[in-house]
Amino acid sequence: MRKLAVLTSGGDSPGMNAAVRAAVRRAHFHEVQMFGVYHGYEGLMRGDIKEMSLGSVGDIIQRGGTILYSARSEAFKTEAGQQRAVEQLRAHEIEGLIVIGGDGSFRGAQKLTEKGFPTIGVPGTIDNDIPCTDFTIGFDTALNTVVEAIDKIRDTATSHERTYIIEVMGRDAGDLALWAGLAAGAESIMIPEASQDMDDIIERLHAGQRRGKKHSIIIVAEGVGSAASYAEAITKETGWETRVTVLGHIQRGGSPTAMDRMLASRMGAAAVDLLLEGKQDRMVGVQNNQIVDVDFQEALAKKHQLDLSIYQLARTLSI
């Protein structure tokens, strides 16, 4: 292969730029041309493709977001859209494509492989919800952003003796809520993977109050429902002043942590190596701190498994 391309798709995550940088520089190391596809699959169908030099990825390792931009595309989900994407790649004489994104992005990459075009996936999402990899690019940065926010909210919760409910992202996965809750010492954590009824939460709050605790932090993953509804229920049952903070898209932004920069660099370079080895229809991952690659079909068929031992630990430490 003499020409490769890279695109970012779906929700942005801190570290995507580091992965793009690694892919471009690894390709140049192997004397292979690298092209950037701008605006995800939507841009791919339009032919928004430009060659990337070593200088084009200078000073981006520390930047959040993605210099290639990202967009969701309904048109790409169609047979005609996918065929148009392949035609654009071949028109530019590109022989392999690296897709950085989440499970939806990988399904798109798999469609291209089915049409005879080699693709490799790199997991980039703050949700950490991709099977077959311990971590995804952006999770560590988002985790640190959430913990920092919780620490600040706890200051005001303590000052006003209030209960605060903080809603974090994650779609149907509770990793971000769970890890942040443990790291920030939350009194209760609500995630999709572990049922916890309101009576249990209120009893734990009452138990803390009996020990002299005058404020509480509850972390709610967006996949379990609205934080506002839980706040209303707690106020109704206890009469306590309860506030809600929805952290929102602040969790996606910011300069990536050293951990995310390292992970993205390793994964981006590995994706290039896999294509040059003649591999395709695979996803790069990290397991036990070792870079691995797994079949797309295997990764997409499995369900992400949250480590419930962390949840049990958080419950025992929040008494």
UniProtKB/Swiss-Prot annotation:
User: What's its EC?
Assistant: 2.7.1.11
Superkingdom of this protein's organism: Bacteria
**Molecular function GO labels:** 6-phosphofructokinase activity; AMP binding; ATP binding; fructose-6-phosphate binding; identical protein binding; metal ion binding; monosaccharide binding
Q: Which residues bind ATP?
A: 11, 72-73, 102-105
Amino-acid positions noted as binding substrate in the UniProt annotation, renumbered to this chain: 125-127, 162, 169-171, 222, 243, 249-252
Q: Where does this protein reside within or beyond the cell?
A: Cytoplasm
On assembly, the entry states: Homotetramer.
List GO terms (cellular component aspect).
6-phosphofructokinase complex
Q: Which NCBIfam families match?
A: PFKA_ATP (TIGR02482), PRK03202.1 (NF002872)
Q: Which UniProt keywords apply?
A: Allosteric enzyme, ATP-binding, Cytoplasm, Glycolysis, Kinase, Magnesium, Metal-binding, Nucleotide-binding, Transferase
List, in alphabetical order, the GO biological process terms annotated in this UniProt record.
Answer: canonical glycolysis; fructose 1,6-bisphosphate metabolic process; fructose 6-phosphate metabolic process
Kindly tell me the pathway this chain contributes to. Carbohydrate degradation; glycolysis; D-glyceraldehyde 3-phosphate and glycerone phosphate from D-glucose: step 3/4
- UniProt xrefs under InterPro entries: ATP_PFK, ATP_PFK_prok-type, PFKA_ATP_prok, Phosphofructokinase_CS, Phosphofructokinase_dom, PKF_sf
From which residue to which does the signal peptide run? none
Its name, as the record gives it, is: ATP-dependent 6-phosphofructokinase
Q: Which residues form a coiled coil?
A: none
Q: Which residues form the active site?
A: 127
Q: What role does it play? A: Catalyzes the phosphorylation of D-fructose 6-phosphate to fructose 1,6-bisphosphate by ATP, the first committing step of glycolysis.
Q: What's the family? A: Belongs to the phosphofructokinase type A (PFKA) family. ATP-dependent PFK group I subfamily. Prokaryotic clade 'B1' sub-subfamily.
